[in-house]
Amino acid sequence: MDDLESTCASLRAQISATETQLAGLKRALHEAEQAAAHAKAQSAAATTAGDNHDKPRRWPLLDEEYRRYGRQMIVPQLGLPGQLKLRSARVLIVGAGGLGCPAALYLAGAGVGTLGLIDGDMVDVSNLHRQVLHRSANVGKLKVDSAIEYLRELNPHPTYIPHRAHLTPQEAPEIFQNYDVILDCTDNPATRYLISDTAVLLGKPLVSASALRTEGQLMVLNNPPRPAGDKTGGPCYRCVFPKPPPANSILSCADGGILGPVVGTMGVLQALEAIKVITSTEDEVRPPSLHIFSAYSSPPFRSIKLRSRRANCAVCSAERQVTLDTLRSGLTDYVFFCGSVSPEAVLTAEERIAPREYRAMYPAPTEGAPEKTPTLIDVREKVQYDICNLAESINIPISTIQASAAGSGDETGSSLPAWLPPEIASTDSTDPIYVVCRMGNDSQLAVRRLKELGLDRGGARVVADIQGGFRAWREQVDPEWPEY
């Protein structure tokens, strides 16, 4: 027994040492790739200069640059000084998706000198309706490489630096320190807090935006950048949102949906704000505001004035708890701070059924009638239910189910909510109840809620979810089921 324990301890130590070595190799590779990208860009710039290298330049820009940028240079707010500032600016875009694509497109077109892009995802066909730098031919390609390929065709003058991985607290400081302005084009709270914290700690202005369905928000944060405790500095993301939203309230574009022109509008506005930050003087910095865009409202734009830095902010106050050391060491846990959004542990294996097993037990109505007919509840929102649905299902949206508090009844005094159909609410029925959703997440929450209402009759009635939702249904039962 002692020998086995010693062997296990030795293996753990070897694994730990190997993981440490691997992390070091990854950092070394990242640094080497950055150095190679810079060297390649400098070589290209030297080649472009060509014959002009040995003779004094009469004008500060190349002749081709005057022709390319002339229409924006004659705008009074920009002019030649602004164009020169753009050419020397280094901008980092975190996220090459719906926000990052239009932002990168317009910054590259405007002549920003160095443009870095961070993203570890690959292009999916579902991205193409809104992520305008990616083409159908690039499905399956890294988003960063796909985006830079397009940008180089648009404007070969800027230096494009790819960061082919998701942002981590350990690597963020080393990446951010090489840039002047940061754009947050991500879609999850944990990364937003990480980006803001790193930008504040390194003194970088941050342009942050978000978009979902038909609405978007935009803020310029940490502008002007000031040391911790300096109240004249711009607020950070933590100053505006000291506490993250509840984990179960967060919707991604995949879950909530997104209209392409909406996220495109916000990305273009990010590019505009970045240009203003780069070309403006400190005297021209405006008070911080939250800009809200609602595509179906009139007027569609409104702004809310933001407060200055919070006196007790965890990152930009004099008594900050977040530092570069806590980032690099992993002591600042962003996933823990924001909470987990995964409902994987909500139900046990006995409370779930695979799509193929469900269809084997209960054939479609046209194929035969089972002895015990189950109730199949589809908890997708009505707009999704109307896209495609199973004929034998009924639609009770998850928002309706979650809106009623446990144990609350309707106005008649019933112990069950009014949204339950009579055949489900009947105290005599033991017919099974199955719940299905799009991905297999909301259905678990719905099953738990139905059991809280006592619909499982103390275990005498099956109340279960179809594991993996309609995504798994397409894989296991019906390959023609629409995937959206």
Swiss-Prot record:
Keywords: ATP-binding, Cytoplasm, Metal-binding, Molybdenum cofactor biosynthesis, Multifunctional enzyme, Nucleotide-binding, Nucleotidyltransferase, Transferase, tRNA processing, Ubl conjugation pathway, Zinc. Binds 1 zinc ion per subunit. InterPro entries: MOCS3/Uba4, Rhodanese-like_dom, Rhodanese-like_dom_sf, ThiF/MoeB/HesA, ThiF_NAD_FAD-bd, Ubiquitin-activating_enz. It comes from the Eukaryota. Pathway: tRNA modification; 5-methoxycarbonylmethyl-2-thiouridine-tRNA biosynthesis; Cofactor biosynthesis; molybdopterin biosynthesis. Its cofactor is Zn(2+). Its EC number is 2.7.7.80, 2.8.1.11. Its main location: cytoplasm. Residues 39-58 are annotated as: Disordered. Pfam families: Rhodanese (PF00581), ThiF (PF00899). The active site is at C253 (glycyl thioester intermediate), C437 (cysteine persulfide intermediate). SUPFAM superfamilies: Activating enzymes of the ubiquitin-like proteins. Residues 39-49 have a biased composition (Low complexity). ATP binds at G98, D119, S126, N127, L128, H129, R130, K143, D187, N188. Plays a central role in 2-thiolation of mcm(5)S(2)U at tRNA wobble positions of cytosolic tRNA(Lys), tRNA(Glu) and tRNA(Gln). Also essential during biosynthesis of the molybdenum cofactor. Acts by mediating the C-terminal thiocarboxylation of sulfur carriers urm1 and mocs2a. Its N-terminus first activates urm1 and mocs2a as acyl-adenylates (-COAMP), then the persulfide sulfur on the catalytic cysteine is transferred to urm1 and mocs2a to form thiocarboxylation (-COSH) of their C-terminus. This is Adenylyltransferase and sulfurtransferase uba4.
